């Protein structure tokens, strides 16, 4: 559903930011 997509996007976005700031 849409909410799952939003949550997954948020998770990947956060992980990408954390990975980028290493």
Curated annotation (Swiss-Prot):
UniProt keyword annotation of Zinc present: no
Disulfide bonds: none
GO cellular component: extracellular region
Keywords tagged on the record: Amphibian defense peptide, Antibiotic, Antimicrobial, Immunity, Innate immunity, Secreted
Compartments in which it is found: Secreted
Tissue: Expressed by the skin glands.
Keyword Secreted tagged: yes
Domain of life: Eukaryota
GO terms under biological process: defense response to bacterium; innate immune response
Record's function text: Has antibacterial activity.
Family according to the record: Belongs to the frog skin active peptide (FSAP) family. Brevinin subfamily.
Protein name: Brevinin-2LTa
Protein species of origin: Rana latastei (Italian agile frog)
């Amino acid at each position: 559903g849409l909410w799952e997509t939003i949550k997954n996007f948020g998770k990947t976005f956060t992980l990408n930011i954390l990975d980028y700031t290493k």
